[in-house]
Amino acid sequence: MSATQKGMFVDTSICTGCKACQVACKEWNELPMEDQAAVHLGNAFLAESYDNTGHLSATNWRHVKFMEQFPDDRTQTQGRWLMMSDSCKHCVQAGCLEVCPTGALFRTDFGAVDIHNDVCIGCRYCVGACPFGVISFNDKYDSNEGGPHMVKGTVNKCVLCSDRVANGLGTACAKACPTSSITFGNLDDLKRLAASRVQALHTRGQTDAYVYGWDLKAEGFDRPSTGAQDLKVVGGLNVFYLLLDKPHVYGLPDRDPGLPQKNILPNAGGALLMAGVLGVAGVAAFRKRRMDAAGAAE
C-alpha cells in the first residue's frame, strides 16, 4: 500500500454524547432507521438511558455508547458518565479479512477495510471472526428500501467513508463532531495527537487516560511512563481510542484477541466428513441389528 495510511482518533475524554456523528453517518451513507424492536430497547431511551441505538448493526455503523457510573441513589456529586463513539476499528490484522472466502472484504489503499457487497455470499464467517462485534448481517433491506449500501443477504459495517476519503475528504462523523472528539487524518499524525492528549491529561492528574489500539511509547512517541499504559491489539487499530477506564467498561477486549484461524473452511469440511462417516457407520450398525433380530426371530 503506497498511499498514506489514514485513520481516526477518538478521544472519549471530550465526547459529549451529542450523537452528531451517528446522524452524519446515517445521512451520508443513506442508511435506514434502526428498528427499535431489533435492538431490544423498547422505551429505554425515554426512561433510563440516552442510548437510543443499543449497538452497531447492518444499518447502524456508528453507535455512541453511554456508560453511566453512578451509585444507586444517583447522588449528583458522585459518579460520572463515560461516552464513546464506536465503529469499525479497521484493524491492521483484521480477522474478517483472514476468514472471508470470496475476497468481499478488502483493504483499501488508505488502510480501511471495505466491502464488495456484490461479492459477499453471506456466509457470515467475518461476523464471528470480528473480536469487536462490528460486522452484522443484513437480512432485511435491499437497495430500494435501505439505500445504496444495502444488499439483502450480505454483511455491512463502517467503511471509513472510503468514497469521501478517495476524493480527498474526511469522514462524515469527524466532520460533524463539534468537540473534535473524532479526528480524521494521517495515522502518524493521529498517534502524535493522541500522545499529546495523554500527556496533557496525566499532567492535570487524570492518570487513568491511555490509548487503546496502539502502544505509543513503543511507536516512539513521548507519553508518561506512569499511570495507565497503552494497549496495542490486533497489530494496531486504524481507528483507535483514548479511554479513561478499563477496556471492558467500553465493551472492548481487555487483552489482545489475536487473529482467528486463517482458513476455517478445511475445518468445516473435516467436521462434515466426520459427520458423514459417523452417519454411514450408524446406518450400517442399525441395519446389522435389524438383520440379527430378524435371524433370531426365524
Regions found by a protein language model. Give the residues of each.
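Non-ligating segments of multi-cofactor redox enzymes
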Residues: 1-298
